[in-house]
């Protein structure tokens, strides 16, 4: 039996351990606290991510280990993408800072995906519908 999982934009505690590879949520919170403002790329309102809480992923993995027999590949995400700008605005409002727009780096333009969203049909068919922590709830918890 082989089970594979595609994780979509994982967030949660310990993101600082990823260094430069930390996600935007962590980076924006750090910018707000250290710089007093948040930098987002131009057109951030058109960049969407399916943010997935690491705690939900851990629970899903435990459920798979105890209930799912069989092989497959499953997408793991909330299925609800949110724009970079919406997330940055939520953090900026909490931290009481402004958002500054910067150009997207040239090295990102050709390889950057503007939208990610997990197709959860196979996951739901295998293990049923799940309640995922909404990214805005996490942002509120981490304030």
Predicted regions and their residues:
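Short beta-loop-alpha junction of Rossmann-like oxidoreductase domains
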Residues: 13-16, 122
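Conserved beta-loop-beta element that borders a ligand/cofactor-binding pocket
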Residues: 1-14, 39, 99
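C-terminal substrate-binding subdomain of Rossmann-fold SDR/epimerase-dehydratase oxidoreductases
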Residues: 32-143
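Active-site "substrate specificity/gating" loop of NAD(P)-dependent dehydrogenases
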Residues: 16, 20, 44
């Amino acid at each position: 039996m082989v089970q594979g999982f595609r994780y979509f934009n994982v967030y949660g505690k310990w993101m600082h351990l990823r260094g430069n590879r930390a996600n935007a949520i962590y980076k924006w919170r750090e910018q707000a606290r250290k710089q007093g403002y948040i930098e987002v790329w131009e057109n951030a309102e058109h960049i969407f991510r399916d943010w997935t809480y690491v705690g939900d992923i851990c629970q899903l993995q435990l459920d798979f280990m105890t209930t799912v027999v069989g092989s497959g590949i499953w997408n793991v995400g909330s299925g609800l993408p949110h724009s970079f700008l919406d997330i940055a605005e939520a953090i900026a409002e909490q931290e009481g800072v402004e958002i500054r727009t910067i150009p997207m780096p040239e090295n990102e333009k050709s390889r950057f995906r503007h939208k990610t969203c997990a197709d959860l049909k196979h996951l739901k068919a295998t293990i049923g519908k799940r309640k995922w922590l909404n990214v805005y709830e996490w942002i509120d918890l981490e304030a």
